[in-house]
Amino acid sequence: MTEDISAQSASGGPASSPFAELYTRAVDSLLDIQVEDRRIETASGQTHLLTAGDPAAPPVVVLQGGNITNPVTLSWFQALADEYHLIAPDTPGQPGKSTGETPPAYGPWVCDVLDGLGVDDAAMIGASHGAGVLLEAGVHAPERVTAAALVVPAGFGTPLSMELVRIALPSLSYRVVPRGWLLRQALAPMFTRRASGIDGIVLETIGEVLREDDLAAEFPGPEAAALSGFAAPALVVTGERDPFFPGERTCKRAAEDLPTLVDCLTLPGERHFLSPAGQARATERIRSFLAGQAN
């Protein structure tokens, strides 16, 4: 079940915003599970969220990637709804239905979401930008995060590379001349699948982000020294060929910075936006990780 979003844009602005339609279409196109909508008040404004699975099951918070809508990220991990109560808030400042601007720090916002739902603590999954948000939450309130799964994660630095140049140049060109071939050229280094195999709603959403603003060049996450206070058992899943957070380098940084790292899995051949096979493998590794923490 989804709510009528005709009266509100994805970012809390006017209803004419194209993200409103893109959000609904992503729910319809990408999610095979039933979801329900909720809104809660936080210090960062009103936060919209999707929930799925049995409310009596153990809660798992899913924190969205950047430059895409929440249901796109949720689709990666939706299979977990058979065992967990998935809670997926729209991050303020990202395409979605939450109001408010990007908060100065994400940790208090995550705590506000938990408080608004009456959840004392929860396991959490963060993808890309969402992993940086999760790390901030774990440092801000370590008692609220029981386990952390960080997938193609921000928070461990981004090295300069020619792959990033291959993304940046056509992205800038696309803003001036919004042609499909430029968009596909910009996204090719990020996606494991060829552009022809990517769901159209994902391409349209990122294209709209580029037309509205630049792709996020800065990612959340605490300073490395602050991670010494991160208490939750952590799983890291990387893509071997991820241009933003390369697999081997990210695993090395995670091992250095995260005192509670349980495992770092690198998916061979995967880039930043995982293929369906990569998404499935990441989800099943997260399932076994969460089961291990529950025992």
Stretches with model-predicted labels:
Residues 88-125:
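Active-site loop/oxyanion-hole signature of alpha/beta-hydrolase fold enzymes
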Residues 126, 130-134:
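Gly/Ala-rich beta-loop-alpha elbow adjacent to hydrolase catalytic centers
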Residues 261-295:
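Catalytic active-site module of serine/aspartate enzymes centered on a nucleophile-bearing elbow/loop
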Residues 135, 139, 147-175:
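Flexible "cap/lid" loop of the alpha/beta hydrolase fold
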Residues 45-95:
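Conserved HGGG/HGGXW glycine-rich cap/lid loop of the alpha/beta-hydrolase fold
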Residues 77-79, 235-269, 278:
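Conserved loop-alpha-helix segment in the C-terminal half of the alpha/beta-hydrolase fold
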Residues 161-164, 176-232:
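Conserved alpha/beta-hydrolase catalytic His-Asp/Glu region
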Residues 1-59, 83-84, 287-295:
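Alpha/beta-hydrolase fold catalytic core
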